[in-house]
């Protein structure tokens, strides 16, 4: 292709056409996060940079955003496209455990205590026996991959969810009914990713503007004098 077509072919790499990782990826994860929590966050902060891809792009190649809800719960979005070790996935983490939707698995937070022998080895490796009693550890570390988790539906998912998306689309066409709250979900996914991008650009904490709130979940629209 002609070099003159570069910006049109790779439009996702330029702020003129795209907001980069926030609009191309984060919007989907943010929608899932607010759906899972049944809440919309109140503020966002973060940082973005171009640290690896020096190919002329002007959108960030790595971003990190923290969305904060009114009760202190946080939803984070991190993307580093120069490393694919962890892939693309969501993790819903709470005091009782963790859910990984892509894998269809959940992991209980409470696990069986370490066997006495493992505890002894751990104490020895950390030289607890040479320390004062109050300085020793009272637990044995457990790496994440030792907790195998359980499948949410009792067995490994048979697909990656693509077929479910197609089935939902076909059902909407046949019944001529939109999925519930699809407009509200789409609106807030768009607003959250754009607000996150603005926070990255301005390097400051931004609150969700009252004038853009609609009647959905924990948000209420603000009635202006003209609208009353």
Which role does the model predict for each range below?
Residues 39-47, 74-78, 99-102, 178-182, ...:
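Acidic/polar loop patches that form or flank catalytic/metal-binding clefts of enzymes
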Residues 2-10, 138-145, 162-170:
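Active-site-adjacent bridging/hinge elements
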Residues 1-57, 87-91, 203-205:
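Predominantly a Rossmann-like dinucleotide-binding segment in NAD(P)-dependent oxidoreductases
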Residues 55-57, 71-161:
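NAD(P)-dinucleotide binding in Rossmann-like oxidoreductases
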Residues 16-23, 49-53, 78-80, 150-159, ...:
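Active-site rim elements
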Residues 55, 154-157, 163-164, 168-228:
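C-terminal helix-rich "cap/oligomerization" subdomain common to oxidoreductases
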